Amino acid sequence: MIDSFEVKPLRRNFREPFATATGTWRTRESMVARVKYMDGHVGFGEVAPTPGFRGEMFSDAHRFLSLWEPRMEIPDHLPLCRAALGCAGSSLWRTKTAFPKIKTAALLRSPEETNLPLSNVLKAKIGVGELGAEIATIENLLTRLPAGSRLRLDANGSLSRTEAKAWLDTFEGCSQIEFLEQPLAVTDRNGLMGLAESNSLALALDESLLDVQIAEEFLADGWPGYFVFKPTLCRDWREMETFLRNEPTRCVVSSVFESPFGFEAVLRVASLVETVAGIGVNPLFVEDDFSLHAMDMVLQPGEVDIPQLEELWRSI
């Protein structure tokens, strides 16, 4: 049972404007929920509205959580509030055994970066500029990848079927590309299945997976690719954890620029699968009191522990 509940808003600035297919980010706004249970355990969850993903506005979430009490139902139109409270109640906050270490992918601010991170897996956003120019940029990037590294391409659902086919045809059989993430809009399920079945280059679902039920439907339909889960945006944590445990080699855990509270939760979830996690936060933010996690290529869930998060919470 819940003993107490609190919520606090946060605001962090990116070092540089961050461009995606849905626009340019300069500031990250979120809210952190702290839940203390009658047995003394504490859990945290973060409401982190993210452009391009379904979810309530920051103002709506803040208004609701400011008045929320443990016995109140969370309405369907507030999935991020559900996600945050589900996260706070996860058993991963209570785990006493050591978590396995997590290998991480490096997110490029731009595929034209000259000093590439020394990571085995890098991620580049596409669908931001003109098709031909972007393909040429990625071709150039592949010539500069560290030996043995792989590249993930993330379109954020911005491509048409014709554009997606152009990407797949260009890089057909390219072993340096691990997968093309969410090439088509969430609503184009037939298009996604068709692309996945007709090309050797692996695809991954991302924006499509805010509900575990959708992942299960794709799995039942024979989806051959990857499933990218953003736990902070997933409304049912218990179902998500079960799915990840059942598909550890095909699920990728990804972050959405959380504060240390949400980021630590994502790290702990990433310990459930065997793939390289799509996470990375601090290098993109201005250095501040929230820079608790090291941004190494290998991270240790639990290294930032509950007492440290409690101390940070009190400082907000």
Regions found by a protein language model. Name each.
Residues 52-55, 131-135, 158-162, 174, ...:
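Loop/helix-junction capping segments adjacent to catalytic residues or to phosphate/diphosphate-binding pockets
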Residues 107, 122-131, 150-157, 175-188, ...:
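Catalytic beta/alpha-barrel core
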Residues 3, 102, 119, 148-149, ...:
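A structural micro-motif
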Residues 25-35, 207, 211, 215, ...:
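Long, acidic, intrinsically disordered low-complexity segments
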